[in-house]
UniProtKB/Swiss-Prot annotation:
Chief place of localization: cytoplasm
UniProt xrefs under SUPFAM superfamilies: Ribonuclease H-like
Function, as annotated: Could be a nuclease involved in processing of the 5'-end of pre-16S rRNA.
Lineage: superkingdom: Bacteria
The name this protein goes by in its record: Putative pre-16S rRNA nuclease
EC assignment: 3.1.-.-
Gene Ontology terms, MF aspect: nuclease activity
Compartments it resides in: Cytoplasm
Sorted UniProt keywords: Cytoplasm, Hydrolase, Nuclease, Ribosome biogenesis
Biological processes, Gene Ontology terms: rRNA 5'-end processing
Residues annotated as transmembrane: none
Any one GO cellular component localisation term in the record: cytosol
Native source species: Chlorobium phaeobacteroides (strain BS1)
Family: Belongs to the YqgF nuclease family.
Lineage of the species this protein comes from: Bacteria, Pseudomonadati, Chlorobiota, Chlorobiia, Chlorobiales
Length: 144
């Protein structure tokens, strides 16, 4: 029997100070944190990730106001999506609404019992937000 190709989905919660990454398990059933990285190094980090993992899609948190209108960060994300598409032309990049994901990630970390210091260390909030974006995506596409 042949080997089943394993493809993952990579989620990005892009920020001006830190960028969180999350990936699916090999069967695209649930999200796992990858880590938090400086935004100026994120393309290099993703290239390295792609050398070790087969990725079928990249999703990017897309910041909209609660009424669905764009905000100042939306333009930055549009530029980042263009940069991703140019760097990785064979992988589709899909923006998904991230409204409230960081706030929800903060609540999850608080409920997990982590101290404020540990929640803030190494940008756990950013990778948790990327995980929540990805899990929400999986649930809405019927993968979870």
């Amino acid at each position: 029997m042949g080997k089943i190709p394993i493809k993952r989905i990579l989620a990005i919660d892009y920020g001006k100070k830190r960028t969180g990454l999350a990936k699916t398990d090999p069967f695209c059933s649930f999200a796992q944190p990858v880590g938090t990285f400086p935004p100026e190094k994120i393309i290099t980090i993703i290239k390295s990730f792609l050398q070790e993992n087969s990725v079928e899609k990249i999703i990017v948190g897309y910041p909209l106001n609660s009424d669905g209108t764009k905000n100042p960060m939306t333009g930055i994300i549009d530029g980042f999506i263009e940069e991703l598409s140019a760097a990785f032309p064979d992988i589709p990049v899909e923006p998904i609404d991230e409204h409230g994901s960081s706030k929800q990630a903060g609540k999850v970390l608080i409920e997990s019992g982590l101290s404020r210091k540990k929640r803030q260390r190494k940008g756990r909030l950013d990778s948790a937000a990327a995980c929540l974006l990805l899990q929400h995506y999986l649930e809405n596409t019927g993968n979870a």
